[in-house]
């Protein structure tokens, strides 16, 4: 991993702030044609509490700042040989040890890129209560994921850049200094966060199965793909399942079955 990093920051009159950063990263985990990525971010903030129109409120509003930032950063494959086809040993052929290909090469593998917008407020009241609020939206492009392959290929999956995903949410933190003396202090901290996740686009297929999860356009990345449990038969205690068989019109039946192999996953 090699990185070149630079940043510029500017502040004026303790009220207005701006920043810019840039980095260029190169990694041997990617092929020579795709291993370099350019990432950047811009930010700005306005300290309202320093403005003259806030003077009448200075005993209440100790500090207040509005923040905004936008930028892109990158993620690498977790493995060292993501773009290589690799071999392993341990099998025997005609009594002789033999290597075999256990991972398929992907020379087009590239950086996963996150485009993030963040808007925030920092607020201090009575010099005792501090509130931080952030709203964000993050779009991930060239999403890194193991895509399942047809078994006729001889491989189970391939690591590839499959599409686009979006996260949107907010974070709130409230901190208070309730008691502050020489011998005793009492502070309180509360936080709340919420995130909504959705796969926007998949490259080749509208959906594919990944273990007990389904990766599907319009659904969360962590959408579970299992047989639907219908409870326990009160007569004999056997587990029951909804069959969820789909007809030609796309409607699913809700018949009860006892063998999980007779039920479709949803």
Label the predicted regions:
Residues 1, 17-26, 48, 94-102, ...:
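Flexible, solvent-exposed coil segments and beta strand-coil junctions
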Residues 1-5, 91-130, 157-181, 218-223:
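Outer-membrane beta-barrel signature, preferentially recognizing the C-terminal barrel domain
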Residues 15-18, 51-54, 127-131, 170, ...:
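Repeated loop/turn-to-beta-strand initiation elements of outer-membrane beta-barrel proteins
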Residues 18-20, 59-68, 119, 131, ...:
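Transmembrane beta-strands of outer-membrane beta-barrel proteins
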Residues 22-28, 48-50, 70-74, 135-141, ...:
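Transmembrane beta-strands of outer-membrane beta-barrel pores
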Residues 62-109, 137-161, 200-203:
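Surface-exposed extracellular loop regions of Gram-negative outer-membrane beta-barrel proteins
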Residues 111-154, 186, 193, 197:
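Membrane-embedded beta-barrel scaffold of Gram-negative outer-membrane proteins
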Residues 160, 179-266:
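Conserved small-residue
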């Amino acid at each position: 991993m090699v990185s070149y990093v630079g940043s510029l920051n500017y502040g004026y009159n303790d009220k207005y702030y701006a920043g810019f950063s840039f980095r260029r990263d190169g990694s041997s985990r990617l092929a020579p044609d795709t291993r370099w990525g350019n990432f950047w971010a811009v930010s700005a903030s306005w300290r309202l509490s320093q403005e003259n129109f806030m003077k009448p409120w200075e005993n209440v509003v100790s500090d207040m700042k509005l923040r905004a930032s936008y930028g892109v950063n990158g993620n690498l494959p977790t493995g060292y040989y993501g773009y290589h086809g690799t071999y392993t040993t341990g099998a025997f052929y005609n009594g002789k040890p033999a290597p075999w290909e256990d991972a398929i090469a992907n020379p087009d593998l590239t950086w996963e890129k996150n485009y993030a917008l963040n808007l925030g407020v920092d607020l201090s009241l009575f010099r005792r209560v501090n509130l931080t609020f952030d709203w964000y939206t993050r779009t991930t492009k060239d999403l890194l994921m193991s895509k399942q392959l047809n078994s006729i290929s001889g491989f189970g999956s391939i690591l590839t850049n499959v599409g686009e995903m979006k996260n949107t949410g907010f974070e709130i933190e409230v901190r208070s200094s309730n008691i502050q003396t020489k011998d005793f202090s009492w502070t309180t901290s509360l936080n709340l966060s919420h995130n909504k996740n959705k796969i926007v686009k998949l490259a080749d297929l509208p959906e594919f199965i990944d273990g007990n999860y389904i990766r599907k356009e319009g659904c969360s990345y962590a959408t579970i793909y299992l047989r639907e449990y219908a409870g326990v038969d009160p007569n004999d205690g056997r587990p029951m399942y909804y069959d969820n068989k789909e007809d030609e019109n796309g409607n699913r039946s809700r018949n009860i079955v006892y063998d999980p192999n007779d039920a479709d996953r949803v």
